[in-house]
């Protein structure tokens, strides 16, 4: 979900001083009242240095920084052990996907990846009933929520059922994180090099700009959208079409097409071809090759030990 958030904070320092006397011999304390101590780097920090900072110039922030969160929501810090797990998963299911696609060349992902990934332990719940799983700020920072729900012992990424509940067990890494990561990365790429305006006309007049949250994914398919969120507006429609296609197996994608019916399927396929052409002509990315890498890695994720950094 691409929600631009600008957070400004003002800090007002107030001091009340009572002067009861002054002695010329009193010395001012030369020490600053502000702590200059820095947090000592642990094993995880050193791992992040080698796996995120040096190769990609990404700051992976797992510690809770109050100023980095939206003050309109009550959220909690990410669990330390689960932060290590998501760091390994982001590397395996996102960064290395594009490295595989580029035959090991990290230039592409290093150039366009967001510079900050911030983890939050809980989700953000909006007043209209939607849940914020991830946000991106102008392509520079990605916030990932709900980290504390990760199952360390059963890593699972669903690729076959687009209508499986994200709250169903085992915890679905694709539904909760990596669909969103690919969605937000699509926004970064289209904001760098825009997609053809013709896409905006495919579902013109059919978007649910104010009530998309009430549109179910199955209902959306019949209207020519891959998800309820895609029905909100054309930029989200484009990114959702991309991220849904590349994170679903052919069988999973076919379930959406079958649900859509003849009219809805024709619209969805028209959008898919527009997305496919954009990535091919603009970025030299074969959508089906990217998808095959994502599906392969999604099925391999069950073999990852999330309790160690090895």
Task: Describe each region flagged by the PLM.
Residues 1-8:
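Bacterial N-terminal signal peptides that target proteins for export
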Residues 4, 23-103, 107, 265-310:
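Acidic/polar, low-complexity intrinsically disordered N-terminal segments immediately downstream
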Residues 17-21:
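C-terminal motif of bacterial Sec signal peptides marking the signal peptidase cleavage site
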Residues 27, 84-150:
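Auxiliary, metal-adjacent structural segments of Zn-dependent hydrolase domains
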Residues 72-80, 152, 164-172, 176, ...:
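Second-shell loop/turn segments in exported
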Residues 144, 158-171, 175-196, 239:
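Active-site recognition of the HExxH zinc-binding catalytic motif
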Residues 178-220:
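Acidic, glycine-rich loop-and-strand cores that form catalytic or ligand-binding grooves
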Residues 206-310:
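Metalloprotease/metallohydrolase-associated module, dominated by Zn2+-dependent proteases
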């Amino acid at each position: 979900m691409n929600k631009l958030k600008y957070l400004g904070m003002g800090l007002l320092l107030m001091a009340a001083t009572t002067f009861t006397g002054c002695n010329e011999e009193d010395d001012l304390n030369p020490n600053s009242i502000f702590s200059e101590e820095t947090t000592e780097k642990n094993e995880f920090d050193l791992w992040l240095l080698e796996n995120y900072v040096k190769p990609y110039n990404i700051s992976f922030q797992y510690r809770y920084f109050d100023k980095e969160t939206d003050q309109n929501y009550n959220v909690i810090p990410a669990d330390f052990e689960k932060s290590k797990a998501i760091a390994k998963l982001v590397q395996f299911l996102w960064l290395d996907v594009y490295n595989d696609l580029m035959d090991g060349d990290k230039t592409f992902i290093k150039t366009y990846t967001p510079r900050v990934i911030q983890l939050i332990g809980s989700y953000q719940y909006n007043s209209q009933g939607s849940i914020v799983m991830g946000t991106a700020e102008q392509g520079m920072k990605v916030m990932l929520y709900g980290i504390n729900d990760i199952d360390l012992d059963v890593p699972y990424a669903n690729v076959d059922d687009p209508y499986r509940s994200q709250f169903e067990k085992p915890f679905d890494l694709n539904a909760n994180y990596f669909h969103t990561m690919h969605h937000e990365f699509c926004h970064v790429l289209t904001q760098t090099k825009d997609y053809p305006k013709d896409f905006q006309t495919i579902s013109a007049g059919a978007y649910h700009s104010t009530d998309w949250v009430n549109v179910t994914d199955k209902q959306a398919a019949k209207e020519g959208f891959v998800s309820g969120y895609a029905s909100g507006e054309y930029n989200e429609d484009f990114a959702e079409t991309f991220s849904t296609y590349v994170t679903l197996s052919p069988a999973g994608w076919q379930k959406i097409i079958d649900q859509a019916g003849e009219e809805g399927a024709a619209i969805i396929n028209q959008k898919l071809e527009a997305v496919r052409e954009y990535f091919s002509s603009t970025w030299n990315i074969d959508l089906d090759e990217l998808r095959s890498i994502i599906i392969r890695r999604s099925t391999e994720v069950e073999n990852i030990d999330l309790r160690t950094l090895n």
